[in-house]
Amino acid sequence: MDIAALLSGGVDSSVVVHLLCEQGYKPTLFYIKIGMDGAEYMDCSAEEDIELSTAIARRYGLALEVVDLHREYWDNVAAYAIEKIRKGQTPNPDVMCNKLIKFGCFEQQVGKDFDLTATGHYATTLQLGGKTWLGTAKDPIKDQTDFLAQIDYLQVSKLLFPIGGLMKHEVREIALQAGLPSARRKDSQGICFLGKINYNDFVRRFLGEKEGAVIEFETGKKIGTHRGYWFHTIGQRKGLGLGGGPWFVVKKDIQDNIIYVSHGYDAEQQYGYEFRMKDFNFITDNPWEGSTGEEEVTFKIRHTPEFIKGRLLHDEEGYRIISSEKLQGIAPGQFGVIYDAESRVCFGSGEIG
């Protein structure tokens, strides 16, 4: 069986290679090079990533190829993020990177020549009813199915997640015992295309600055200023520069460039119990095809370890979730990710409208 393995230079993908080789496979290794447009935005950490990936390839006597998808990434993912921010929405570039780049452009250019593509994502695949479904990882804190919930059936049916059945500390221990060069490397943080670039610097480059008012939601009183609504997201608590907190963003007026904040006077105004999703993507199948009732599900609206219980309803306008608990920071542009009631199978996701 011919397997393509995606390397990032981190401990997770390195352990993927180690496990595949222990099982007798000889995967071909690929490092996908992405990044911002413009030399001043190129991330120097990519050089270290490639060095570590090269060391892994040499360690196991495997071929490593660097696949440059910088232009494809810029056209498909970075541009998407900028447009969402411009509209006052909260983008999720990691979701689109998986859908369009790692399992999109890479598959079209390279992966098509292999039987399977292995990655270091914390996820699993399940065989149910003769079909492949996206399953959650053993480690709920590291589970990354929410970042994979926009892929399609052709993509999930070719994916292999060798570390999905392991806890993070087990992965780290395997790397230490095997003496892998990335064994003690810290996990990457933040948006995938920014690398070490400051998020606000990225936004400022493309959207500039424009002073606007910060208004207390409950009283209508102006309590400060900001440099542009596009620097702020619903639910944001840090970086507001306001005294007397904690404050968090509860609303944005895009037309008048106003940020509304609150810190707990009226909890019912700050939270919601339901949200709608548009253009819902079922990864494998719609398990409720033809059903007109409510379905018991679990879901996520951001990358957190917790799965929230709720009810999924379908009407002429699409799908909506009624949560069993209050939800803070329901952000248009993010994705509502739907799972079965046991949080075992990830069915797909839709953009929160």
From Swiss-Prot:
Catalytic activity: S-sulfanyl-L-cysteinyl-[protein] + uridine(34) in tRNA + AH2 + ATP = 2-thiouridine(34) in tRNA + L-cysteinyl-[protein] + A + AMP + diphosphate + H(+)
InterPro entries cross-referenced by the UniProt entry: MnmA-like, MnmA-like_C, MnmA-like_central, MnmA-like_central_sf, Rossmann-like_a/b/a_fold, tRNA_2-thiouridylase_MnmA
A GO BP entry: tRNA modification
Stretches for region Interaction with tRNA: 142-144
Location(s) in or outside the cell: Cytoplasm
Site note Interaction with tRNA, residues: H121, Q334
GO CC terms: cytoplasm
Keywords from the named record: ATP-binding, Cytoplasm, Disulfide bond, Nucleotide-binding, RNA-binding, Transferase, tRNA processing, tRNA-binding
Residue positions binding ATP: L6, L7, S8, G9, G10, V11, D12, S13, G120
Catalytic center residues: C97 (nucleophile), C192 (cysteine persulfide intermediate)
Disulphides: C97-C192
EC number: 2.8.1.13
Region: Interaction with target base in tRNA, residue numbers: 92-94
An example Gene Ontology molecular-function term: tRNA binding
CDD domains: MnmA_TRMU-like
Pfam families listed in its UniProt record: tRNA_Me_trans, tRNA_Me_trans_C, tRNA_Me_trans_M
Cytoplasm in keyword set: yes
Family listed: Belongs to the MnmA/TRMU family.
Function description: Catalyzes the 2-thiolation of uridine at the wobble position (U34) of tRNA, leading to the formation of s(2)U34.
Annotated protein name in UniProt: tRNA-specific 2-thiouridylase MnmA 2
Gene name, Swiss-Prot/TrEMBL: mnmA2
